Amino acid sequence: MARRRPTAHVAHPAQNALFAMTDLPTPAAPRRLFTALFPPPEACAAIDAERQRWPGLPRRLHPVPERMHLTLQFFNAVDAPHERDWLAALQTLRFATFEITLTQAELWRAPSGVIAVLVPEHTPELAALHRATAQLARQAGLPAASNGFKPHLTTLRHAERTTLAPLTEPIRWTVRQVDLIWSDLKAQPPQYRRLGQFGRRAP
């Protein structure tokens, strides 16, 4: 019988449709996992409003607002033992809340094509959180890099014909936890499944 993990924090109600959830059996095959920072709904709405202003948008806008995030670590195939160790390591994560401010829109060339991203101000708090989560991933036996971190939030895929405009104003949100996400590409439609939320200080 498959072993079950302890139940993680409950997902935000506004995201339930996209983040099915948590008490899932131990996987038989490696899974596509990443840690990330998700903006709250009001910040997602502001990001979506900004991209709606850009000329040359594709017919369908991906990602949808609820799936927008800033990735900390990403691994394409994590087996069950490493996943369990990563979950255990992330349980020890603690950090003070801090603010992310998205200030600039840029076009980047990715393996899947041109994407539009929003880039945040560089802050010591975000850099420290990336280092801390990378160290926890390495403790779990995963090859996380500490250097070369380029924080960004992907706002639009298939942006080859899109012309960006400066943001009307910076977009801010307060970071309170780190999410561990399983990107389930086999689901129809593909889903993000939240495996846990980490880093909240005790009240």
Where are these regions (language model features)?
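Histidine-dependent nucleotide/RNA phosphoesterase domain, centered on the 2H-phosphoesterase fold
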Residues: 2-203
